[in-house]
Swiss-Prot record:
Function: Could be a nuclease involved in processing of the 5'-end of pre-16S rRNA.
Enzyme Commission designation: 3.1.-.-
Listed name of the protein: Putative pre-16S rRNA nuclease
Gene3D superfamilies linked to this entry: YqgF/RNase H-like domain
Subcellular location: Cytoplasm
Length: 143
């Protein structure tokens, strides 16, 4: 059952954004990049989304939704909601939120287990977290 269009997932931070993408059948996730930008310069992240939309046919944008460990809304949650509104104003694309609790911790543990140095981890942690966010989303679509 092919879906054909891909899903792009983001782990949005204050000055970095991890990107990951699905295959066309929505079964496999791949880390794309860790994009660095000036603090709160979300326009540059919007432009980077445009770049990936030109590279791949994308039908859904999944944003990591940073709830607190207790499942409550936080200032970072509001930031991601604001960013989602910016995306919707710029593109006709379905935007969905995916709980991202502990994804960075999970990515960090994985990289530590591989013996990756701190410096190298900092260069890939967000794109790996985006991949985990996307995997979680894809798992909700299996049935």
């Amino acid at each position: 059952m092919g879906k054909y269009n891909r899903i792009l997932a983001l782990d949005l931070g204050i000055k970095t954004c991890g990107f990951a993408i699905s295959d066309q059948n929505w079964k496999i996730s791949y880390p794309l990049e860790q994009f660095n930008f000036n603090r709160y310069d979300f326009a540059s992240v919007i432009s980077r989304i445009a770049f990936w939309m030109k590279e791949y046919p994308i039908s859904i944008l999944v944003l990591g939704y940073p709830l607190t460990l207790a499942g409550k809304i936080s200032p970072r949650t509001k930031m991601v909601e604001y960013f989602a509104d910016l995306v919707k104003k710029n593109y006709e694309i379905k935007v969905v939120f995916q709980d991202e609790r502990l994804t960075t911790k999970q990515a960090q543990t994985f990289l530590l287990d591989l013996g990756i140095s701190f410096k190298k981890r900092q260069k890939v942690i967000d794109k790996l977290a985006a991949q985990i966010i996307l995997e979680r989303f894809l798992n909700t679509k299996k049935g």
